[in-house]
Amino acid sequence: MGDKKENSYSHILKYTGLFGSVQGLGILVGVLRNKFTALFLGPSGMGLLSLFSSTISVLSSACNFGIPTSGVKFISEKEHAADESQSEKADIAGAVLLVRTYSLLAAFFGAIVCVLLGPLLNGFTFSWGNHTLHFILLAPTIFFTILAGGETAILKATGQLRALAMQASLLAILLLLVSVPVYWIFGERGILPVLFILAFMQWALNFRYSRRVVRWGVNMRKMTLVAGFPLLRLGGAFVLSG
């Protein structure tokens, strides 16, 4: 019992230090990226970047069914039950399948909502010009942002903390290497491509690690979707409370 407790403390300290280092790297890279972004985009470009980023955050949070949070609890409960019964990992794989299935549905839902609300968002956000097309073009970014949230939930629930740390480090560095040249060459025209690349890279890195835990797959059968209702109920509560 004492050895188990000591190992638990060692595990906590180890990953606290790891995530602290990752956070420090993220802050340093973020400062450099923001400095170059402000230099190449100017005040108006920074304003556009902020508005589009806020739109992505709001729509993805509202349309993701709360899966980035509820998915962690849903999978963790299955994993804990499997550990206690020493059974196969079928229940865990089934839980991951549900999370990925509903993440995909939520991603399509978020993209469709973004397209439909494009004119409304333009009128609500801007008092000059017509940026409806820009908001519509955010749909693929929202799609991959929601998908990435589902894969992140899988990594958290299965305890892949090292993978999460690696993903965060690589994402910060890659975003710096991609965004600065794009803003330098294209200026404000590069904002939407950079936001899309960020969302896609986040999903791709998460998927690279999560597929090692459970092979990718979705199931749109009625029985499978019904089995995911507890996931949706919990996720809906998180969305409403957030």
Tell where the protein language model's regions lie, with residue ranges.
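Positions in alpha-helical segments
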Residues: 34-35, 73, 153, 238
